[in-house]
Amino acid sequence: MGERVCQRTATELSSYPTELEAHVTLTDQRRIRIRALHSREERPMRVLHARLSPRTRYLRFLSPIPTLPDALVRRLACVDYRRRLAVVAEDEAAGCAGVVALASFSAVDETTAEVAVVVQDDWQRQGVGTALVSTLLDAAEKRGFDRFVASIAADNWIIRRLLDRFGRVVTSHTSLGVSELVFVRR
């Protein structure tokens, strides 16, 4: 499925969204650069995943994944900038080697997108997640998505609070420690 899903036309691949690029000063005065993940750009995801604590990995993937399987990395890196988009935050001091967070959306249907976000532990609670989710949801809305779905650990109050800032939950279902949230932008 991974290879077939990632076959893109030249037009899709040439439509890299430079308008998503931004520089942000965080609450601790560190600076990040936000940009879209390039199609098939796998390395930042692997580097970021290796830097995450086991708890943060669990909260993101709802499973203790010590290393990202190749098939999952290929699927996550398969972006077309319309129905699948990912944005990363880079530590400006470290450049491209310093990816500290990633947020993504993937179309569920024509108006609904599934969203996910992860921030490296030592960069959490500084505004990185807020900046990335804001960029991601703005981009999704410009592409016609007005409803969002997120699967989160039921005890992940940090991401729940972050999503509450950006939207109003219209449905929520929790089972076996996982909450499925459907929300719309405020």
Language model features by range: what are they?
Residues 2-186:
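Long, contiguous binding/interaction regions
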